[in-house]
């Protein structure tokens, strides 16, 4: 059996019951990386039900909200260390990402956002007019000039 030994944790629990909030900060840890032509973000949300997730985007700011319901007030808790309540996390995305085509999936407590790189941010070739000598094409990725 677990023993209660931390009086401050009991005060936190009491404050949560009375005020509806916890004195401990709620966290939503994440990893982010680029994978080929997309930007990937994964949030750890163990114990969160998929229907409590809410993802909004306004301009280039993505807001992720999730909720873990509080403990049944009739239950006498011996330990209550998992954060409860509403969690929020905002990401400011660069202009080089296509926010119109974001995909989201949720499996095994991990929310994954896949955000494609915008077409305007991808490398491309630009044709340069050389007057009477024809055109040259500049390959931005290889930094070379090709006679056309």
UniProtKB/Swiss-Prot annotation:
Alphabetical list of CDD domains matching this protein: ACD_sHsps-like
Gene3D superfamilies in the record: 2.60.40.790
Pfam family, one: HSP20
Annotated sHSP domain residues: 21-131
Family matches, as PROSITE patterns: SHSP
Function: Not known. This protein is one of the major immune reactive proteins in mycobacteria.
InterPro entries found in the cross-reference section: A-crystallin/Hsp20_dom, HSP20-like_chaperone, Small_HSP
Organism (species): Mycobacterium leprae (strain TN)
Signal peptide limits: none
Similarity annotation: Belongs to the small heat shock protein (HSP20) family.
Protein's name according to its UniProt entry: 18 kDa antigen
